[in-house]
Amino acid sequence: MSISASMVKTLRERTGAGMMDCKQALEEANGDMEKAIDWLRQRGLSKASKKAGRATTEGLIGCQVLPGSTSAVLVEVMCETDFVSRDEVFKKFVDDIVSQLVANFHNNDVDLLDQPSGNKNLSIRDLLNETIATIGENIVIGRSIKMELTPGKNGMIGHYVHTNGKIAVLVELATETKETASSPKFQELAKNIAMQIAATAPLALNSESLDPLKIDREREVYRQKALEEGKPENMIEKIVEGAVKKYLKEVCLLDQPYIRDDKLSIAELIKKVSNEIGEPISIIEFVRIQLGEE
């Protein structure tokens, strides 16, 4: 397969590897981008892990938690420059979109752009076009997310938005009683876990909920890397399993060290607060979005 300059450029942007290394990786992978990334990682040539999560698109993520903290919304709105993302007109537009999502929380049948804005004479689409004309930059409404407390459960939706508005998190915590769900200690736990998710970008709650194919892919990368480094044959499986264990500790929320006290894992933190409160606490789900990420 012929390897184009644009393919090399894309791989270089995704991994940070050298141009010739990217070209060789694509040739070895017969043009398959994901296999080329693995080829680079196996040889220690990829810087993708350092670049993961870096989003270049400007804009803001709007967030609003409804009264009682039993539901919340996030919406990603992108623009072209950081200057516009700090403009009051743009910020008001983001607030209007969030308010519309809240007002129509249970209405999933009508496209967001076709819903009325705060100005009843304008749809969201009209308001978008009007804001683009006012600001002079293209604006794109990206992902919108709604999270609601699981029916029949007591708990709350914790949230955290990074101060620059580029990362936002929602997390559902459950407990036994409404009294506990409204207690300061429970609410503080929800906030701290949301901050943890924002800072560490976990891929799953635990290893059981992580895609097995992703674990298999990591295992194969570590195995090939060990072979490339000439590790003893009888040590390779032990090295691979150690690397996989470390990987799971990094990407599974419950296994991660707590950012405010790394002597505790998140699972241990939850158990500690559960014991203090006298009721079991569990994380049901979470979502983390970073501006411009796919």
Swiss-Prot record:
PROSITE patterns assigned: EF_TS_1
GO MF annotation: an example: translation elongation factor activity
Primary localisation category: cytoplasm
Cellular compartment(s): Cytoplasm
Family named by the database record: Belongs to the EF-Ts family.
Function statement: Associates with the EF-Tu.GDP complex and induces the exchange of GDP to GTP. It remains bound to the aminoacyl-tRNA.EF-Tu.GTP complex up to the GTP hydrolysis stage on the ribosome.
Protein name as it appears in the record: Elongation factor Ts
Taxonomic source organism: Lawsonia intracellularis (strain PHE/MN1-00)
Species lineage: Bacteria, Pseudomonadati, Thermodesulfobacteriota, Desulfovibrionia, Desulfovibrionales
Underlying gene: tsf
